[in-house]
Amino acid sequence: MELIKKITAPNPGVFTGGGTNTYLIGKEDLTLIDPGPNIEEHIDEIIRAGKNKIKRILVTHTHTDHSPAALPISKVLKVPMYGRLVDGESAWEDETFIPDVVLNDADLIKTDEYTLEVIHTPGHASNHLCFLIKELNCLITGDHIMDGSTVVIGPPDGNMRSYIDSLNKLFKYKIDYFAPGHGNFMHLPKKTIESIIRHRLSREAKVIRKLEDSGETNLEALTALVYDDVSEHLHSIAKFSFCLLYTS
């Protein structure tokens, strides 16, 4: 774990859990991944921790809790930003992020200390990327996989089919643990992926069953039926994923 330093942003909430995780990779040639929200104290902490060794900024996706700090840090340190733009519209888009380097699936970012492989994982967002630290078999997952919570897949940019496909895609990589965008490091990656896929498919089957059994068409009522195992105060969030299941 010497190559990885985690800094958690002070933005706890229903969507973000304990806060957004920012990662510094390397010892001398540092890569900053997901600088997080544009919060001054968080940006200051990142710059202090980087000790003038940050050479590039990578973003897993451009939601407002992951990328807004990229531009101010890039300007201060005079380093390039790497990532992708969304394919269309997004409900939570950070409009300040425009990558200097556009990343594509299977791209490699090589330094003398480590190699990062880019894995395009659309689903949570069309431009979502994961980054595999080859020397550690550690996957920086962003919001593709989170600790302690399932991922919200919401319209218009989210796509449940793409999300399942992107989860299955990870089986071909050698991964020993996850460094998620929210929460703690996660071991047993294969079992974690299998569990998420089972959960999503089970939820989809439940949607079909509830639609057939109830005949209900009201979105709020259907969400309550499908997510009756989830605390009611989270139904407003669950509704985003339900919209995609309902219309798929």
Q: Which sequence ranges carry the predicted segments?
A:
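Short acidic, hydrophobic short linear motifs in intrinsically disordered regions
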Residues: E216-H233
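Conserved small/polar residues in nucleotide/adenosyl-binding loops
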Residues: Y246-T247
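Hydrophobic/aromatic beta-strand patches that form the interior of the parallel beta-sheet core
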Residues: K5-I7, L58, Y82, V101-L103, ...
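Short helix-to-turn junction characteristic of helix-turn-helix DNA-binding domains
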Residues: L211-G215
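Active-site HxH/HxHxD metal-binding segment of metal-dependent hydrolases
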Residues: G13, G18, P37-T115
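Conserved beta-strand hairpin/beta-sheet module of binuclear metal-dependent hydrolase folds
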Residues: M1-K51, C130-G142, D147
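Metallo-beta-lactamase
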Residues: L30-L32, P37-N38, T115-P122, S126-K206, ...
